[in-house]
Amino acid sequence: MTDLPDSTRWQLWIVAFGFFMQSLDTTIVNTALPSMAQSLGESPLHMHMVIVSYVLTVAVMLPASGWLADKVGVRNIFFTAIVLFTLGSLFCALSGTLNELLLARALQGVGGAMMVPVGRLTVMKIVPREQYMAAMTFVTLPGQVGPLLGPALGGLLVEYASWHWIFLINIPVGIIGAIATLMLMPNYTMQTRRFDLSGFLLLAVGMAVLTLALDGSKGTGLSPLAIAGLVAVGVVALVLYLLHARNNNRALFSLKLFRTRTFSLGLAGSFAGRIGSGMLPFMTPVFLQIGLGFSPFHAGLMMIPMVLGSMGMKRIVVQVVNRFGYRRVLVATTLGLSLVTLLFMTTALLGWYYVLPFVLFLQGMVNSTRFSSMNTLTLKDLPDNLASSGNSLLSMIMQLSMSIGVTIAGLLLGLFGSQHVSIDSGTTQTVFMYTWLSMALIIALPAFIFARVPNDTHQNVAISRRKRSAQ
């Protein structure tokens, strides 16, 4: 990229800045949840909604982000995304109740949903095709650093300042990013087809109400009748979308995608697989602090080996898949992740704390291999005219399944424990043990889906390109 104009390089830095903000926020909050609960006067069992409100909003808003960027312009939407994300961060820091915090996190999610896909679109507009891969590698690198710094930085801020600072640090960064976007980024637009508003609303309602219904009386305090009503509304909304999308060329996501068997299997496996693995980044720091008595900073440091293991495997996952094939790799990594989850629980409860970093490093390696394999399996055989739509649907499913995973983790904690789980409670470790055993079972279940992948699905010439497109 050395031959790119200075203006283009600055524009790439702005996009990288946005990627860093969004990725940092996905991990920095996890370590602070027990402290937030204490400050807001809430049970730690309710705090999973702080993550769910953000991730679910991202899932709901993702389908609209690309269309808005094409219609209104990439600069205008990227600027709006940064402003909304920054305002959401300010309101999070000012929140005095859990409900206020959840609303502020949802506002953050609207900005986060637009930031990454619009950033990818911006790179496509400003960089020549032959340099697109190098440019995307450059702008996504800060996005890989964010999860590495997030847990430790979150723990450090909570321990030596307060949880409010995990949001306040976004404000100066956001202001600089917004000003730089207005000054340096071109406002590319293009012809767009009519937005499928009906399909968007049906999907949004279906995803949101079913997730709320899943949280149930333990998290939302709803009556059984209200929960049944939410389930009915969600199911009806999704069925109506299927009827709406059938033979509709303007549908948000074409049902033709599911004619490709590897896409159908990959999407189903990604949805089920990320429900299980989505529990881990939430549950691990909560368990370390509430179950084992770690300080926030110590718990944050313990998350770093997991991220390092994940980053290290990305270099060799192509060779692994090409050598053994998708079915073997996905079944093995799914069952392996379940076993590593049990190993983490066992070593932690036995007090072998010096072993935990190695177990978490192994967990990161296995999880990264599975993620990359799921992403590329899902997209690799799609025809070119459906690749963009398939990638958008996969991105939405990734966020939705993560929000469901965190919701189920909170539900399991509420099922096995009281509303007053604390470090001083004698039953706390038992509650976490049952929760961890249930998680290991949920993580293993997608192996049945991956076992249906054709055994000869291993030719993977374009895996590295497709893999990055799905991250």
From Swiss-Prot:
One molecular function GO term is: transmembrane transporter activity
Keywords, sorted A to Z: Cell inner membrane, Cell membrane, Membrane, Transmembrane, Transmembrane helix, Transport
In what way does this protein cross or attach to the membrane? Multi-pass membrane protein
Q: Which compartments is it annotated to reside in?
A: Cell inner membrane
Q: Which ranges sit in the Periplasmic compartment?
A: 1-11, 70-76, 125-137, 186-196, 246-262, 307-341, 417-430
Membrane-spanning parts: 12-32, 49-69, 77-97, 102-124, 138-158, 165-185, 197-217, 225-245, 263-283, 286-306, 342-362, 396-416, 431-451
Q: Which domain of life is it from?
A: Bacteria
Q: Which GO CC annotations does the UniProt entry carry?
A: plasma membrane
Instruction: Report the InterPro entries cross-referenced here.
Output: EmrB-like, MFS, MFS_dom, MFS_trans_sf, Multi-R_MdtD
The primary location reported for this protein is membrane
Q: Which stretches face the Cytoplasmic side?
A: 33-48, 98-101, 159-164, 218-224, 284-285, 363-395, 452-471
Identify the PANTHER family for this entry: BLR6921 PROTEIN, MAJOR FACILITATOR SUPERFAMILY MULTIDRUG TRANSPORTER MFSC
Report the sequence similarity comment from the record. Belongs to the major facilitator superfamily. TCR/Tet family.
Q: Which NCBIfam families match?
A: efflux_EmrB, PRK10504.1
| Protein name as it appears in the record | Putative multidrug resistance protein MdtD
Species source reads Escherichia coli (strain 55989 / EAEC)
